[in-house]
Amino acid sequence: MACLGRPGCRGWAGASLVLVVVLALAACTESVAGRAMRATDRSSGLPTSAKPARARDLLLQDGDRAPFGQVTQSRVGDSYFTSAVPPECSAALLFKGSPLRPDGSSDHAEAAYNVTGPLPYAESVDVYTNVLNVHDVVWNGFRDVSHCRGDAVGVSRAGRSTPMRLRYFATLSDGVLVWTMSNPRWTCDYGLAVVPHAVLVLSACGFKPGFPMAEWASKRRAQLDSQV
């Protein structure tokens, strides 16, 4: 386990010695997340003969249940960030076009979800024909998210967010990275879930902290692993 920003967790120096796991970045504040630099190719390059699943089929579907209730798919809107200031916070802030996703996917899909109350939630998934190195994708995600060390502003078509800070990031289970960006008025919890042929990015934002992203991202990873 590696974590930072909560009592009982070791700092970054200790965390860097631990095998890291994934996330699901995402981004939002009074607006939500976006797009930016793409990561270098982190796949192992190993081919597979299995026919890849359709990315859209791997997202939560209408009527599925999440921690906040039953969901209905909708379009990822203009409030999701397309860039971050400073750029080194892109990995921690962006959902749409997250740089945590390895290059070379064969299919991509994303969706926002209509839920009860002020909790914007979204998922994106990329499918890969080649086998991903799960450890490397998660480790690189942990490293890239940790580079956001001060105030970060998300920029979207809807405008600029108020500054947020990275409050917590951890790899609490295999293939999963979670982190939290927040300010006094808004909290965004992100998750990255990685399996050998797919990467799932999760974003949940709201006025109050406490979304169970670690448990939810681990559950979504297990579901993903059974589908691809």
Swiss-Prot record:
Its main location: membrane. Keywords: Cell membrane, Lipoprotein, Membrane, Palmitate, Signal, Transmembrane, Transmembrane helix. A lipid is attached at residue 28 (N-palmitoyl cysteine). It is found in: Cell membrane. The chain crosses the membrane at residues 191-211. A lipid is attached at residue 28 (S-diacylglycerol cysteine). One of its GO terms (cellular component) is plasma membrane. It is a lipid-anchor. The keyword Methyltransferase does not apply. The keyword S-adenosyl-L-methionine does not apply. Residues 1-27 form the signal peptide. It comes from the Bacteria. This is Putative lipoprotein LprH. The lineage of its organism: Bacteria, Bacillati, Actinomycetota, Actinomycetes, Mycobacteriales.
